[in-house]
Amino acid sequence: MEVNILAFIATALFILVPTAFLLIIYVKTISQSD
């Protein structure tokens, strides 16, 4: 079973980018509420 590197990278980006985006918004919201 071969692992398609491009598919792996695409999947990782598809998961990490929205997660990082949400984390940034979350941190900014917490900072503003203080």
UniProtKB/Swiss-Prot annotation:
Cell compartments where the protein resides: Plastid, Chloroplast thylakoid membrane
Q: So which domain of life are we looking at?
A: Eukaryota
Q: Does the keyword Transmembrane helix apply?
A: yes
Where is it mainly found?
Answer: plastid
Write out the similarity annotation.
Belongs to the PsbM family.
The family database entries (NCBIfam families) matched by this protein are listed as: PS_II_psbM
Which protein are we looking at? Photosystem II reaction center protein M
The source organism is Cucumis sativus (Cucumber)
Name the encoding gene, please: psbM
